[in-house]
């Protein structure tokens, strides 16, 4: 039977042969030829007319015509004896098969066996038919209408050619030929009338597999392939293996124009449309490496800043809601990668997940590696898999470089204990409190990690500058989503302080409320950057700003004041003593609302208020409303007094000169910055019986002065002070001493024996961690 073919009517495309390459110039140019500063772009030669969905299966009539070789076979294959069979055909990756393998379709038809696919158009031919030319015959497919016929035609063409390209590109020999085939494959996808996600993804997956199996390509070959597939990436996410290839190129050639011209629209699309980096972590890693590549350019952060501006847009409100969450996710992952090598390499360093799950047990093992990170591991996926394993380790890390311990608060809270099965979470900030002996510890990162950290912290700063992004950014950062190593890193907390300051300056409640903890029992940025917190480096200036904005909002309540009184009364008093108006107002409100029940604490607050002009004025206004407070002050000074941590000699002098302290019997200067110079003020307290100098810089000179004047002192705590035998020997004149703590001092055994002999009332002595122990 004479079977002819035609392009069909209606002007629609009926047959697609190999499309011509769309790159300008000779496609056979050698690989080494440079493409110019700007990668070439292809025009999208989209077919006019109908669009079709790629078929994967469907019902159709099938007829097979065998080529006649004898007179009898010619009679048997004539149109009068021809029969049609209904089949449900599946267009698999390798062949055309029937759901009921009988009759004509007893055996599947491989795409490699199909020589040609054409539309039938001859006189008296069956309507809506396709012709598949195979060795020894022809397969006719009859659809129900012309649209289905064309849909089957284009789908079969696509499946056949994709199968061919998979075969051709699976065994590359000459890379100039491979590059030409890739370009033709891309052009075929761009000009196809089929509309389906796999139309663009299939070529990308073929190229991705090709690159993963050939890792010895030159840089120029890398760039040529990237430029060739660039048109497909404008509307499609790259597959995971292709992301790995892009990451490698960003690391090895950060200054390549391909990074700017090709990767920029790809990353922009990822940030605008990605919904969950957890399902595609390599997209996040590619975005991370792309931004680092931008940072390596001559302009550095200026280029990154312009990129962030382009993502936000020129208006006051970013039109893409997914950009900010995706940028924050990339920043958090990059910052974590800076510390991840240290987290994974130290046996006694738990992951942040373990801390949040309450997996804490004391451990005395010494770390084997210094706190120094070189290059972060590029395989973020494997790192995340490692971190997901539960490792029940300690959160107490002791070494010459870092010492992290659980702080014992002055409110006598129960000890923090948790087991692996406990649902309660430990206080993260308490876990980060650095002991005074190690307060000068600094974490040093390697050069690459340091650049990465600086880049992404700077991005967080840029994000915080946009008013429309700030509420969401504050909400995302409210749970403190950083590893404890980062929070113990002075450089990180110092740089991040700008972001927290922006939150504190924002008048919107939805922003500055995120400074507080995400729920009760958890610490937030408010606690982290308050005096005594691990991130505080400004003596409470940021803390005062946060309190000011919170008090100016709906937090001017008794509950908020009670929280301050229970947790941050010391910092509030210290800042008020230094003239901070916000803190003076806070103390006045505490008195006015009867937040403080203890009379001694009330007297201490009053003395603090009267030590400054602004405090005295506000206190006088308060006294006009509450005369009973003034009456309380007339009864005399407090018997117990505790100075806030980080108080100085000047702070103590100012406080003691502001009122009467003749009845003061118990004074605690623990964890302050006082020195021996304060001794001249202490000796003016004739009734003083108990003095706590734990972890201060009080030395031998001050100790000698005290021993001459405070002969009635009964309890003295010198734990972790720099005193030596020269000063300790002077204590022999304090015959009333009944309790003496010399823990962690330079006490010698001989001096200890001498003091025991000369102090008959001495009953309690602590000489642990000394030579006399």
Swiss-Prot record:
Residues 1-30 are annotated as: Disordered. It is found in: Nucleus; Cytoplasm. The keyword DNA-binding does not apply. Transmembrane segments: none annotated. Pfam families: PH_21. Residues 54-163 form the PH domain. One of its GO terms (cellular component) is cytosol. Interacts with FLNA. Plays a role in T-cell signaling pathway. Isoform 2 may play a role in T-helper 2 (Th2) signaling pathway and seems to represent the first proximal signaling protein that links T-cell receptor-mediated signal to the activation of c-Maf Th2 specific factor. This is C-Maf-inducing protein. The gene is CMIP.
């Amino acid at each position: 039977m004479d079977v002819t073919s035609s392009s069909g009517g209606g002007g629609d495309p009926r047959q697609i042969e190999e499309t011509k390459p769309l790159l300008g110039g000779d496609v056979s140019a050698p690989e080494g030829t440079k493409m110019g500063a700007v990668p070439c772009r292809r025009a999208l030669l989209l077919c006019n007319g109908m669009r079709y969905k790629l078929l994967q299966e469907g019902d159709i009539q099938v007829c097979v015509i065998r080529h006649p070789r004898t007179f009898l076979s010619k009679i048997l294959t004539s149109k009068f004896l021809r029969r049609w069979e209904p089949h449900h055909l599946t267009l698999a990756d390798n062949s055309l098969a029937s759901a009921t393998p009988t009759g004509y379709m007893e055996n599947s038809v491989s795409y490699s066996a199909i020589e040609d696919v054409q539309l039938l158009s001859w006189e008296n031919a069956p309507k809506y038919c396709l012709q598949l030319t195979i060795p020894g015959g022809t397969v006719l497919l009859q659809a129900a209408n012309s649209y289905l016929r064309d849909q089957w035609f284009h789908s079969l063409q696509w499946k056949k050619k994709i199968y061919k390209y998979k075969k051709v590109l699976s065994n590359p020999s000459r890379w100039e030929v491979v590059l030409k085939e890739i370009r033709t494959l891309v052009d075929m996808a761009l000009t196809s009338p089929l509309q389906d996600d796999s139309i663009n993804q299939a070529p990308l997956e073929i190229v991705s597999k090709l690159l993963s199996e050939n890792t010895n390509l030159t840089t120029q070959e890398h760039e040529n392939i990237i430029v060739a597939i660039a048109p497909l990436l404008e509307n499609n996410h790259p597959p995971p293996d292709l992301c790995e290839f892009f990451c490698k190129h960003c690391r090895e050639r950060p200054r390549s124009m391909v990074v700017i011209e090709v990767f920029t629209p790809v990353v922009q699309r990822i940030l605008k449309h990605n919904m969950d980096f957890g399902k595609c972590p390599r997209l996040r890693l590619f975005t991370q490496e792309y931004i680092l590549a931008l940072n390596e350019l001559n302009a550095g952060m200026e280029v990154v800043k312009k990129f962030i501006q382009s993502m936000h847009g020129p208006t006051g409100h970013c039109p893409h809601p997914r950009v900010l969450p995706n940028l924050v996710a990339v920043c958090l992952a990059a910052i974590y990668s800076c510390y991840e090598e240290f987290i994974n390499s130290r046996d006694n360093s738990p992951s942040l997940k373990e801390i949040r799950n309450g997996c804490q047990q004391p451990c005395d093992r010494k770390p084997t590696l210094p706190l120094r990170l070189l290059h972060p591991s590029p395989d973020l996926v494997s790192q995340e898999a490692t971190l997901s394993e539960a490792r029940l380790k300690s959160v107490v890390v002791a070494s010459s470089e870092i010492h992290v311990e659980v702080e014992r608060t002055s409110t006598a809270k129960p000890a923090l204990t948790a087991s692996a099965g406990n649902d309660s979470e430990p206080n993260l900030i308490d876990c980060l409190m650095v002991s005074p002996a190690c307060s000068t510890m600094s974490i040093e990162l390697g050069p690459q990690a340091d650049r990465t950290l600086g880049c992404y912290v700077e991005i967080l700063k840029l994000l915080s500058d946009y008013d429309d992004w700030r509420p969401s950014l504050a909400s995302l950062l409210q749970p403190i989503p950083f590893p404890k190593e980062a929070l113990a890193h002075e450089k990180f907390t110092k740089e991040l302080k700008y972001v927290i300051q922006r939150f504190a300056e924002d008048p919107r409640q939805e922003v500055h409320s995120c400074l507080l903890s995400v729920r009760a029992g958890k610490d937030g940025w408010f606690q982290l950057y308050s005096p005594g917190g691990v991130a505080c480096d400004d003596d409470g200036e940021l803390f005062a700003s946060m309190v000011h904005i919170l008090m100016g909002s709906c937090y001017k309540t008794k509950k908020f004041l009670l929280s301050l009184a229970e947790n941050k009364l010391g910092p509030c008093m210290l800042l008020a003593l230094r003239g901070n108006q916000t803190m003076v107002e806070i103390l006045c409100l505490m008195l006015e609302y009867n937040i403080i029940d203890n009379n001694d604490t009330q007297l201490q607050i009053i003395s603090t208020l009267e030590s400054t002009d602004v405090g005295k004025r506000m206190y006088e206004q308060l006294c006009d409303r509450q005369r009973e407070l003034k009456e309380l002050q007339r009864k005399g000074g407090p018997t117990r007094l505790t100075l806030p941590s980080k108080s100085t000699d000047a702070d103590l002098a100012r406080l003691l000169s502001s009122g009467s302290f003749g009845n003061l019997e118990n004074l605690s200067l623990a964890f302050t910055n006082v020195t021996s110079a304060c001794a001249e003020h202490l000796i003016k307290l004739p009734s003083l019986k108990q003095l706590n100098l734990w972890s201060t810089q009080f030395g031998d000179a001050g100790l000698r002065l005290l021993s001459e004047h405070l002969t009635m002192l009964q309890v003295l705590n010198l734990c972790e002070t720099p005193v030596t035998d020269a000063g300790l020997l002077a204590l022999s004149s304090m015959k009333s001493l009944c309790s003496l703590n010399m823990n962690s001092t330079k006490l010698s055994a001989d001096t200890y024996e001498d003091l025991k002999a000369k102090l008959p009332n001495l009953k309690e002595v602590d000489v642990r961690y000394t030579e006399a122990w």
